[in-house]
Amino acid sequence: MSKNSSRDSSPEEVSPDTETPSTTTAPKTFRELGVIDSLCEACEELGYTAPTPIQERCIPIALEGRDLIGLAETGSGKTAAFVLPMLQALMDKPQQFHSLILAPTRELAQQIAHTVEALGARISVRCTLLIGGMDMISQAIALGKKPHVIVATPGRLLDHLENTKGFSLRTLKYLVLDEADRLLDLDFGPILDKLLRLLPKRKTYLFSATMSSKVESLQRASLSDPVRVSVSTKNQTASKLLQSYLFIPHKFKDFYLVYLLNERAGQMGIIFTRTVHETQRLSIMLRNLGFPAIPIHGQLSQSARLASLNKFRARSRNLLIATDVAARGLDIPAVDYVLNYDLPQDSKTYIHRVGRTARAGKSGIAFSFVTQYEVELWLRIEDALGKKVEEYKPEKDEVMIFAERVNDAQRVAALTMRDMQDKDNKGRGPRNRKRTRDDLDQDDG
């Protein structure tokens, strides 16, 4: 256990989940929360018209100098809830290596760094991103320029603390643990414990979707007399999310997939699968049918994953085929719908997946395919949600119109996948195998 293990106690509770704002009270502004003008102007430029509930409740507490635990549903705007107070404290007393933000995944870390740079643009904030899959030397050079803020994944940060000459966090003033439950799910616990022993006394913000026993232990080890703010409840989905399921034969899943995509042509959608193989197969099949689909999964190189996300964000591709590597933490605006092509194994993952749409007050739709083999799993998910989800029943004749074209595209995808496997089997090294997977999107640049 770290030297900070005695820092806290039971957190003070603020803003219970059942609390609702008075109907006679106008929405607060960032200025009313105590945010300074230059940061308010940055919020306006980014389209932050009014604080979200997590921002409204967390920012004043953070500005008072308290340690903070924020529990909020995905898409709630929590990044700005910790970045704004952190930047305001930096402006009050500027210094190098002022703040450290830890995130569980490279993609989430990159998004947080982008938010820090955007909100801090008017005050010339220097932010450095430390993640795996990128060159250590380039990152060490960036650290040598003494940034104000570091956004990192735990493993890469520890690499630099142990190996980059002259780098330390002795003067650190703020620590943020974002997606803390995910950090612990990914077995970063031992690394976090080691990092906490290296860090000085500081203000700490911990944000999480859930408050598990592991997160409770991390809170006790890292926070001092914290205030807990909760704007979510267990197994909650966004209020403007419309959910439905399709009970279909397993062998017809691709037919129903193409039917739904055709019905929603031009909209932004994320299709979740259970395996890397299925992600690759669907990407190839759908592109052969004229759908602008791109894959993202854990076996892609970091540069390829970021390239896929950037194309999707830029709307040059409107279908993202994803494993659960993309189900959590990714801030992708304006996703119109989510489709669970393969059901997740538990309700927690279901909530994280469908939380990619209906974000920050917007509406969205979540479809789920339920086959004859998944009825029990679906009933468990419904039970955890605490409600029955409406069934969506397309006319079978309208679906089967696509059968011949889909069958042809399935054959092309199978041949392409076989060719890729043959290349793997001919002794190509890991780098080349990964590059081959990256080439799934090479045909449309």
From Swiss-Prot:
EC number: 3.6.4.13
Cited InterPro entries: DDX47/Rrp3_DEADc, DEAD/DEAH_box_helicase_dom, DEAD_box_RNA_helicase, Helicase_ATP-bd, Helicase_C-like, P-loop_NTPase, RNA-helicase_DEAD-box_CS, RNA_helicase_DEAD_Q_motif
Annotated compartments: Nucleus
One Gene Ontology term, aspect cellular component: cytosol
Keywords: ATP-binding, Helicase, Hydrolase, Nucleotide-binding, Nucleus, Ribosome biogenesis, RNA-binding, rRNA processing
Enzyme's top EC category: hydrolase
Sequence ranges of Low complexity compositional bias: 17-28
Reaction(s) this enzyme catalyzes, per UniProt: ATP + H2O = ADP + phosphate + H(+)
Chain intervals with Basic and acidic residues compositional bias: 1-10
Family annotation (CDD domains): DEADc_DDX47, SF2_C_DEAD
Protein name: ATP-dependent rRNA helicase rrp3
Native species: Aspergillus terreus (strain NIH 2624 / FGSC A1156)
Lineage: Eukaryota, Fungi, Dikarya, Ascomycota, Pezizomycotina
Primary gene name: rrp3
